[in-house]
C-alpha cells in the first residue's frame, strides 16, 4: 500500500510495511460470528456483527483519516488520487457526494479535523516550506517514516478560505485534533522528541503534555474533553533509543511496537491501556468515554494484517471488530455513536487502493 509511506496521523507511513511480531494474549475476546441484520456481504463476510449497512464512499486512490463534523453531517479526509498527486484535504457528504478541496493544493497535507462550530478545519501542511510534494524517505536505511520538519498546523474555513498558520517553530507539527471546547491537541518534535502538546484554537497557550523517550502521538480527545487517547511507546536508554534519536535528528522514524495510552486532558494520570505487542495505533474514544476503538496487527504473526479492535478504557475486554485480510484503520465514531467511519483496502479494484467506508454501528 503506497499511502503507508506518507501518512502522519497515525503511523501510516510505515506500520503496514513492517513485519512485527504479534504476541498472543488472553486479553482478547472475539465477538460472536452472528451477522447483523443489514450487514452487506464483503470480503469479510458475516463475522463483522458490529457493522450494518456498510457503504463505500471513495473509489480508487489513497483515501484515509476521514473524520466527522461536530454535527455528524460531513466528513473531512485526505486523498491522493488521479489529479491529486500529493495528499490534500477534502470534505464530503456522508454519501460520498459533494467533495470539495479544503487545503491549498500545494505541498503535502495531513490530519484534517473540524472545529466544534463546524465553520473551520484544522490540518497540517508542508506548503510553507516548499510548494512541491516532499519526497518519500530513502529505504537505504531500512523501513523508515519521514517526519517532515516543514509540517505546520493551519486553520481554514470549510470552503478553503481564510487560511491562518497556527504553529511556526522549527520541527514537525502535525496530527492535530480538537476537543469540544475548541482546544487543539497535536504531535510535535519542537523539543527534540515526538511528544504531545495542546494549544488554544488560535494557536496560543501551547502546553507540553507528555515527556517520555519515544514516539508519542496521534492524540484524540474524549467526547467530554476530559481525557486524551494516543498511541506511543516509552523507549529506555540503550541501543534502540540511540537509533531512534539518530534517525529523528535526520527527520526519520523507524516504528517499533506501539500500544494505546490514555491521560487526562492536562497530561496527568498517563495510563497504558493495551499490552498486546505488535503495532496498535489510530485510537478513538466511543462517545460513552468508556471504550476505545483502534487498529492493530498484534494478532497477525507476519504483522501485515491490521484489523479494528475495541477495548475498555481499563484495558479489559479487547474485542475484534473487523475480519479483513489486509488493512482496516483510522476509525472514528459519529458524535452520537450510531455510525463508524474507517479506511480499508477491502474490495479494492486496484491493488493498494485505500478507500473510506461508513457503517451503522450495532451495539
What does each of the following model-derived ranges do?
Residues 2-12:
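Bacterial N-terminal signal peptides that target proteins for export
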Residues 20-22:
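C-terminal motif of bacterial Sec signal peptides marking the signal peptidase cleavage site
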Residues 24-26:
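Bacterial signal peptide processing site
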Residues 39-62, 92-108, 156-172, 199-215, ...:
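Multi-bladed beta-propeller domains
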Residues 59-62, 79-89, 104-109, 124-152, ...:
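A flexible loop/linker signature enriched in serine peptidases of the S9 family
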Residues 70-71, 116-117, 179-181, 223-224, ...:
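Residue-level detector of Asp-centered blade-edge/turn motifs that repeat once per structural unit
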Residues 75-76, 121, 184-185, 228, ...:
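Hydrophobic beta-strand positions that form the internal "hydrophobic ladder"
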Amino acid at each position: 500500500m503506497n499511502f503507508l509511506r506518507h501518512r502522519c496521523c497515525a503511523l501510516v507511513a510505515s506500520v503496514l510495511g513492517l513485519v512485527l511480531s504479534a504476541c498472543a494474549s488472553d486479553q482478547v475476546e472475539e465477538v460472536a460470528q452472528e451477522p447483523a441484520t443489514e450487514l452487506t456481504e464483503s470480503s469479510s463476510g458475516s463475522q463483522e456483527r458490529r457493522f450494518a449497512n456498510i457503504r463505500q464512499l471513495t473509489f480508487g486512490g489513497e483515501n484515509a483519516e476521514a473524520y466527522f463534523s461536530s454535527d455528524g453531517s460531513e466528513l473531512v479526509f485526505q486523498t491522493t488520487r488521479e489529479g491529486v498527486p500529493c495528499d490534500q484535504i477534502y470534505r464530503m457528504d456522508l454519501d460520498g457526494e459533494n467533495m470539495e478541496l479544503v487545503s491549498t493544493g500545494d505541498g503535502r497535507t495531513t490530519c484534517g479535523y473540524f472545529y466544534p462550530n463546524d465553520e473551520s478545519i484544522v490540518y497540517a501542511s508542508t506548503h510553507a516550506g516548499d510548494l512541491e510534494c516532499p519526497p518519500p524517505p530513502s529505504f537505504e536505511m531500512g523501513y523508515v517514516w519521514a517526519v517532515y520538519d516543514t509540517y505546520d498546523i493551519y486553520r481554514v474555513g470549510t470552503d478553503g478560505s481564510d487560511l491562518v498558520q497556527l504553529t511556526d517553530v522549527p520541527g514537525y507539527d502535525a496530527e492535530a485534533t480538537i476537543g469540544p471546547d475548541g482546544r487543539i491537541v497535536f504531535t510535535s518534535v519542537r523539543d527534540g522528541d515526538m511528544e504531545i502538546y495542546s494549544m488554544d484554537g488560535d494557536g496560543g497557550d501551547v502546553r507540553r503534555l507528555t515527556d517520555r523517550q519515544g514516539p508519542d502521538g496521534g492524540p484524540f480527545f474524549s467526547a467530554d474533553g476530559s481525557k486524551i487517547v494516543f498511541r506511543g511507546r516509552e523507549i529506555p536508554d540503550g541501543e534502540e533509543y540511540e537509533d531512534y534519536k539518530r534517525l529523528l535528528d535526520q527527520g526519520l522514524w523507524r516504528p517499533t511496537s506501539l500500544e494505546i495510552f490514555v491521560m487526562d486532558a492536562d497530561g496527568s494520570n498517563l495510563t497504558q491501556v493495551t499490552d498486546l505487542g505488535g503495532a496498535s495505533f489510530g485510537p478513538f474514544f466511543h462517545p460513552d468515554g468508556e471504550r476505545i476503538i483502534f487498529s492493530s496487527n498484534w494478532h497477525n504473526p507476519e504483522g501485515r494484517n491490521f484489523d479494528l479492535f475495541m477495548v475498555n478504557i481499563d484495558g479489559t475486554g479487547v474485542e475484534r471488530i473487523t475480519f479483513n485480510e489486509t488493512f482496516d484503520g483510522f476509525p472514528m465514531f459519529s458524535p452520537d455513536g450510531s455510525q463508524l467511519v474507517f479506511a480499508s483496502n477491502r474490495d479494492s479494484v486496484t491493488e493498494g487502493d485505500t478507500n473510506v467506508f461508513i457503517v451503522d454501528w450495532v451495539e
